[in-house]
Amino acid sequence: MIAIGLEGSANKLGVGIMLHPDNGNPPQVLANIRHTYVSPPGEGFLPKDTARHHRAWVVKLVKKALKEAHVSVQDVDCICFTKGPGMGAPLQSVAVAARMLSLLWGKELVGVNHCVGHIEMGRLITGSTNPVVLYVSGGNTQVIAYSSQRYRIFGETLDIAVGNCLDRFARTLHISNDPAPGYNIEQLAKKGKQLVDLPYTVKGMDCSFSGILAAVDGLATTYGLGGEGKDDETDTPIPDADGNGKPTRADLCFSLQETIFSMLVETTERAMAHVGSKEVLIVGGVGCNERLQEMMGIMARDRGGSVHATDERFCIDNGIMIAQAGLLAYSTGFRTPLKDSTCTQRFRTDDVFVKWRD
C-alpha cells in the first residue's frame, strides 16, 4: 500500500509518500518534502499568512514528491491529511487540498491526529517498542504512554507549550526565525555560562511555562537585552555596580533551556516509574534539541534505560509521519468520509482509537 501524507498544522508544509510492502517487509519512505513559512525576526506567524503559504506551495510539493518517489497517481491507495490539532486556517488549507486530490484521483481520505503521527513515525524510525513518549513542540507538550489501544496522556502543559515558550522568547530577543527560532535559541544557549534562577513549575505530572516566560522576558527587558540590533558575537557580561556580571542573551537562553528541560525530565521520569518502562521516545520539533536529548539520556541511563529520538527530517513536522499513521489506520479499515473531513483544532491524542496496536 502507498499513501500520500499532507501536513500543515503550523508554519511547516510537508508532503510525504510512504510504502507499506505487501510482502511484510519494513515500511519505506519514498519521499519526504517540506517547505516552511518564515516570518521576520521578532514576529510569529499569523494563521492567515501561513495558510496563504500552504495554498501557494501544496500542489508544487505534491508534484515534487510524486516525481521523487517514482510513483504515479494510480499507485496511490489513500490520501492522508492532518485533521488536528493545530492552527485553524493552515489546517483547513491542507484539508481542502486533500479533499481536492481525493475527488480528482478517486482515492479515499484518512484524517490523522498530528500527535499520533509523531509517535508512530518515531516508533518506526527508532525501533522503540513500548516507550514513554515525550511529545514537545510549538503547540503541544505531553507525556504519553500506550495502554488499551489509546495513547494515554499522563502529564501535559497547563498553559503554553514548551516550544511556544522558546519561540516567544526568541521574539523578545529578535532572534531570526530561520531555520527556526527554537534552533537559534539552542545555538545561542551553547555560549551561555551563567545559570540564572527562573521559576520552576511542576505540579504532579503537569508543567507550566507561562511564568518562566514572563520572568525571562522581564530579565531581558531589565538588562536591555531585547529588541533589534543586538550582536550575538559580542554578547559579553556587563559588570553591575557591585562588579558582578549581568546575564547576557546567551546566559538567558541557557538558563531558560536548563530550567524547562529539567521540568520535562522530571515528569517523564515519573511516568517511566509509573508504567514500568525503560524507554523514552522524544518526538516533536523541540525533540531535535541536543541538550534535551542529553539531559533525558542521563536520567534514562541512571534508571538502566535508553532514550530514542529522530533527526530533523522526522522530528520536525513532516508529511511522511501523516502517511505512516494514516496507512496504519487505513490497514485496519479506517476511512474518513468527505463529510467528516473537517479539522479539529483541539484534537486530543487520547481521542484516537489505536486499532492497529494490541
Swiss-Prot record:
<dbReference type="GO" id="GO:0031490">
    <property type="term" value="F:chromatin DNA binding"/>
</dbReference>
<keyword id="KW-0804">Transcription</keyword>
<feature type="binding site">
    <location>
        <position position="114"/>
    </location>
    <ligand>
        <name>a divalent metal cation</name>
    </ligand>
</feature>
<dbReference type="GO" id="GO:0002949">
    <property type="term" value="P:tRNA threonylcarbamoyladenosine modification"/>
</dbReference>
<dbReference type="GO" id="GO:0000785">
    <property type="term" value="C:chromatin"/>
</dbReference>
<comment type="similarity">
    <text>Belongs to the KAE1 / TsaD family.</text>
</comment>
<dbReference type="InterPro" id="IPR043129">
    <property type="entry name" value="ATPase_NBD"/>
</dbReference>
<feature type="binding site">
    <location>
        <begin position="135"/>
        <end position="139"/>
    </location>
    <ligand>
        <name>substrate</name>
    </ligand>
</feature>
<feature type="binding site">
    <location>
        <position position="118"/>
    </location>
    <ligand>
        <name>a divalent metal cation</name>
    </ligand>
</feature>
<comment type="function">
    <text>Component of the EKC/KEOPS complex that is required for the formation of a threonylcarbamoyl group on adenosine at position 37 (t(6)A37) in tRNAs that read codons beginning with adenine. The complex is probably involved in the transfer of the threonylcarbamoyl moiety of threonylcarbamoyl-AMP (TC-AMP) to the N6 group of A37. Kae1 likely plays a direct catalytic role in this reaction, but requires other protein(s) of the complex to fulfill this activity. The EKC/KEOPS complex also promotes both telomere uncapping and telomere elongation.</text>
</comment>
<feature type="binding site">
    <location>
        <position position="182"/>
    </location>
    <ligand>
        <name>substrate</name>
    </ligand>
</feature>
<dbReference type="GO" id="GO:0046872">
    <property type="term" value="F:metal ion binding"/>
</dbReference>
<comment type="subunit">
    <text>Component of the EKC/KEOPS complex composed of at least bud32, cgi121, gon7, kae1 and pcc1; the whole complex dimerizes.</text>
</comment>
<keyword id="KW-0819">tRNA processing</keyword>
<feature type="binding site">
    <location>
        <position position="135"/>
    </location>
    <ligand>
        <name>a divalent metal cation</name>
    </ligand>
</feature>
<keyword id="KW-0963">Cytoplasm</keyword>
<keyword id="KW-0539">Nucleus</keyword>
<dbReference type="GO" id="GO:0008252">
    <property type="term" value="F:nucleotidase activity"/>
</dbReference>
<dbReference type="GO" id="GO:0005634">
    <property type="term" value="C:nucleus"/>
</dbReference>
<keyword id="KW-0010">Activator</keyword>
<dbReference type="GO" id="GO:0061711">
    <property type="term" value="F:N(6)-L-threonylcarbamoyladenine synthase activity"/>
</dbReference>
<feature type="binding site">
    <location>
        <position position="317"/>
    </location>
    <ligand>
        <name>a divalent metal cation</name>
    </ligand>
</feature>
<feature type="binding site">
    <location>
        <position position="167"/>
    </location>
    <ligand>
        <name>substrate</name>
    </ligand>
</feature>
<protein>
    <recommendedName>
        <fullName>tRNA N6-adenosine threonylcarbamoyltransferase</fullName>
        <ecNumber>2.3.1.234</ecNumber>
    </recommendedName>
</protein>
<feature type="binding site">
    <location>
        <position position="289"/>
    </location>
    <ligand>
        <name>substrate</name>
    </ligand>
</feature>
<keyword id="KW-0479">Metal-binding</keyword>
<dbReference type="GO" id="GO:0000722">
    <property type="term" value="P:telomere maintenance via recombination"/>
</dbReference>
<feature type="binding site">
    <location>
        <position position="186"/>
    </location>
    <ligand>
        <name>substrate</name>
    </ligand>
</feature>
<dbReference type="InterPro" id="IPR000905">
    <property type="entry name" value="Gcp-like_dom"/>
</dbReference>
<dbReference type="GO" id="GO:0045944">
    <property type="term" value="P:positive regulation of transcription by RNA polymerase II"/>
</dbReference>
<dbReference type="GO" id="GO:0000408">
    <property type="term" value="C:EKC/KEOPS complex"/>
</dbReference>
<dbReference type="GO" id="GO:0005737">
    <property type="term" value="C:cytoplasm"/>
</dbReference>
<dbReference type="InterPro" id="IPR017861">
    <property type="entry name" value="KAE1/TsaD"/>
</dbReference>
<dbReference type="InterPro" id="IPR034680">
    <property type="entry name" value="Kae1_archaea_euk"/>
</dbReference>
<dbReference type="Pfam" id="PF00814">
    <property type="entry name" value="TsaD"/>
</dbReference>
<keyword id="KW-0808">Transferase</keyword>
<keyword id="KW-0805">Transcription regulation</keyword>
<keyword id="KW-0012">Acyltransferase</keyword>
